[in-house]
């Protein structure tokens, strides 16, 4: 029993403005929709159900019914979901605008209550005030919201969400913004609305209001790779595939600085209808390059590493070793379809092997060495502390020699041409015979930064940008990269 969905269904019939604003996919005829994947609350109709991916941001936040309208909370078009979405910092004035919008769209007065009661009492059995028949009148005005942190912005999607105790498999978390407003003023608003209801319904209204306005906020969740769908990718088998984003826009572009003012547009119904009549869609192809996806890929690589290779004498590169149970890697994993990761893995392992051979560590690929446990961490460049510790443990394992207070290790074993070029590029055009700790870190990080320079990467994919940001980046041709041409970040 989704209260917000029911309220939109019944209040949609009040006037022309409501019929436009409160139109939900969940209340319309069902159309074929994508398969659902996660359990959570649909941001569009606020019901707890199975969710599918959004075509505007790739996050799972829309039910299979509402997905037919392709609405995203990051849209420019001021539909109901967008008007309920606020960005930090939320002021008391912003909340006043939200409450005014609620009062305009979902009014409760004596005349309206009698109208709804008369429409329900069609048969003798409906003389009782059963909650399921009057659910649309039992939606209190609260400051309950779902929140998510994207890049440097915190978004709050206000609404009336039932079943807060249910399992939440999405990155959105419940937050109570009552502290940003006056508690007594909000109580007064709801008591006034409640006074027009029959006594039996007043009790249920009060119970719902206090349960949704006095709860404790939950801690924010961290985004993970699984929170984003692969369905927006042009080619799911290509690691450098672009993601197709669809955004709903209007002819009068609204500045992001005025983000929280969208809910005030319905004050002038004629102007709002005119704005909505100018709506259209914009399509963008954006790169999937970001720290979140990169961290996920390197996490898989670190679990597939065969550290025994650093003591081997194989002539082939690390990924091309065959018929050796200690060094042969399973290269059938999808992650190895990414040529960048193949290059990084081969180069890092080749360089480490050169260090081992140069410093007299005579071993064989079948030997068991204590340094092996640190090799996988050398690919976790996004986890700075863990990566630094791994490089330091590797360097100390090589038994460096102290020269004038600085420790050095040798580098006089043959490396492949690609590694040689990277070393020269980062060591003033030379291949040094000795390296200190900083040199070793510089070379190892350069091998990864050559393709994945995480120092200058976004935390989340560009699908989480606002429509104005996408429009600006598109004008600068900064939505895509050149990886399909095998050009690295450095090139």
From Swiss-Prot:
Annotated segments matching region Important for cytoskeleton localization: 82-176
Any one biological process term the GO annotation gives: symbiont-mediated suppression of host cytoplasmic pattern recognition receptor signaling pathway via inhibition of IRF7 activity
Xref: InterPro entries: Rotavirus_NSP1
Keyword Acyltransferase (UniProt): no
Region annotation Interaction with host IRF3: where it falls in the sequence: 320-491
Subunit structure: Interacts (via C-terminus) with host IRF3; this interaction leads to IRF3 degradation. Interacts with host IRF7; this interaction leads to IRF7 degradation. Interacts with host CUL1 and CUL3.
GO cellular component: host cell cytoplasm; host cytoskeleton
Species name: Rotavirus A (strain RVA/Cow/France/RF/1975/G6P6[1])
GO function terms (MF aspect): metal ion binding; RNA binding
Positions of region (Zinc-binding domain): 42-79
Residue window of motif pLxIS motif: 485-488
Cellular localisation: Host cytoplasm, Host cytoskeleton
Stated name of the protein: Non-structural protein 1
Record function comment: Plays a role in the inhibition of host innate immunity by inducing the degradation of key host factors required to activate interferon production such as IRF3, IRF5 or IRF7. Associates with components of cullin RING ligases (CRLs) including CUL1 or CUL3, which are essential multisubunit ubiquitination complexes, to modulate their activities.
């Amino acid at each position: 029993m989704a209260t917000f969905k029911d309220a939109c269904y019944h209040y949609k019939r009040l006037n022309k403005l409501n019929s436009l604003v409160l139109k939900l996919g969940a209340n319309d005829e069902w159309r074929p929709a994508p398969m659902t994947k996660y359990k959570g609350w649909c941001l569009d109709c606020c019901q707890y159900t199975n969710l599918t991916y959004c075509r505007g941001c790739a996050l799972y936040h829309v039910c299979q019914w509402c997905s037919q309208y392709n609405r995203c909370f990051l849209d420019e078009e001021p539909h109901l979901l967008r008007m309920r979405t606020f960005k930090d910092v939320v002021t008391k004035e912003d909340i006043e605008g939200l409450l005014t919008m609620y009062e305009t769209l979902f009014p409760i007065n004596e005349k309206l209550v009698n109208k709804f009661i008369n429409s329900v009492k069609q048969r003798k059995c409906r003389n009782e005030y059963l909650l399921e028949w009057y659910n649309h009148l039992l939606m209190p005005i609260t400051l309950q919201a779902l929140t998510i942190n994207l890049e440097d912005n915190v978004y709050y999607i206000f609404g009336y969400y039932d079943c807060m105790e249910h399992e939440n498999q999405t990155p959105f978390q419940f937050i109570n913004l009552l502290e940003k407003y006056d508690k007594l003023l909000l109580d007064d608003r709801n008591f006034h609305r409640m006074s027009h209801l029959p006594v039996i319904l007043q009790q249920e209204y009060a119970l719902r209001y206090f349960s949704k306005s006095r709860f404790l906020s939950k801690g924010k969740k961290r985004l993970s790779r699984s929170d984003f769908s692969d369905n927006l990718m042009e080619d799911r088998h290509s690691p450098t595939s672009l993601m197709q984003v669809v955004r709903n826009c209007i002819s009068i572009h609204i500045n992001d600085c005025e983000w929280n003012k969208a809910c005030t547009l319905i004050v002038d119904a004629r102007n709002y209808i005119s704005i909505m009549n100018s709506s259209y869609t914009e399509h963008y192809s954006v790169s999937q390059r970001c720290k979140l996806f990169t961290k996920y890929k390197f996490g898989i690589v670190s679990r597939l590493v065969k550290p025994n290779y650093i003591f081997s004498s194989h002539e082939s590169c690390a990924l091309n070793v065959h018929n050796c149970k200690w060094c042969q890697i399973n290269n059938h994993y999808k992650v190895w379809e990414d040529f960048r990761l193949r290059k990084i893995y081969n180069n890092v392992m080749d360089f480490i092997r050169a260090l081992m051979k140069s410093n007299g560590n005579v071993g064989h690929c079948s030997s068991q060495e204590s340094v092996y446990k640190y090799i996988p961490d050398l690919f976790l460049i996004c986890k700075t502390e863990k990566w630094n510790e791994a490089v330091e443990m590797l360097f100390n394992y090589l038994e460096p020699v102290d020269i004038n207070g600085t420790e050095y290790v040798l580098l006089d074993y043959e490396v492949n041409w690609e590694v040689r070029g990277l070393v020269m590029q980062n060591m003033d055009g030379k291949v040094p015979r000795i390296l200190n700790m900083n040199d070793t870190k510089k070379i190892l990080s350069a091998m990864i930064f050559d393709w994945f320079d995480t120092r200058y990467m976004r935390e989340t994919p560009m699908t989480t940008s606002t429509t104005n940001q996408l429009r600006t980046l598109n004008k600068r041709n900064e939505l895509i990269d050149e990886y399909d041409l095998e050009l690295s970040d450095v090139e």
